[in-house]
Amino acid sequence: TVILDAPTVETGTGSNTCNVLGCAESLNFLGVTPEKILWNHVVNTDTSLKDCVQTDSSVAYLQSEVIAVAVEEIRREVLERAEPIFKVKSEEMDIVDGRIFVRANPDQSQTVKEVLFQGDLVPIVITKSKLANAQKTGVPYFANFAEVEVDTDTGKVDVLHLVVINDCGTVMFASGAEAQQVGGQVMGLGETLTEEIIYDEITGVPLNFNFIDYKIPTMADMPEIDPILLEIWKGAGEYGACGIGEGTLTCTPRAIMNAIYNAIGVRINDIPIKPEKILRALGKV
């Protein structure tokens, strides 16, 4: 069993799952699978490790780097514990699929469990921290496409289809990344067409801080959404991963605005693009 303590507070982005999957990948030589990793969910500012914040699409790729550094120390420690058993230096041994063997004589081998359970069982505890490499970036590449219909009599815009493409390097958690892509389109759709805080012109007090007057898109407003993940560019992370969060909605408003322009022939750059703005642009009000 591996206890992984990297107390970043999960906000729904899937970074915890990325950490577990990345840890299992790094410890694959020990025969570790995700099911054998116990995630430490306890976050206490008195005792917990200091970790990176949930921002800038950086958690998964930054933590994958430090996990890889810690894993190298685990490998070294395991091989050093095997030295008195195999009577050879640690550099003369290797670990594959949970078995330790002598390179010159692969038949001379034992499982990692057999080696670690001899004598007193002393857990291997590794604590590592690592500063982000300022020379590398975790920023992804992305693109959006939108198909819309515009009623030129009422000014109503219907978004029929959205395609979001993210090249975020190696995808560590595919279903989580796709969920972020879809969520980004929902937020981008609202930002472009309906969401707006209205202030009292005299007092500056917000007038629509509620879920009735602040118009968030509902399921009934959702178009067909196609999330596409590419793995062409290799980012800053240990596995060639990089962030995805902010990049899921950055281009959505402009894609919808461009589609509206192609539909009515008039450019509107002021969002949200409500029906009255369409009619005003067409000279109908």
Where are these regions (language model features)?
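Thiamine diphosphate
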Residues: 15-23
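Adenylate-forming
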Residues: 10-13
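Short, aliphatic-rich beta-strand segments
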Residues: 1-6, 159-161
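C-terminal catalytic domains of large/alpha subunits in multi-subunit enzymes
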Residues: 22-285
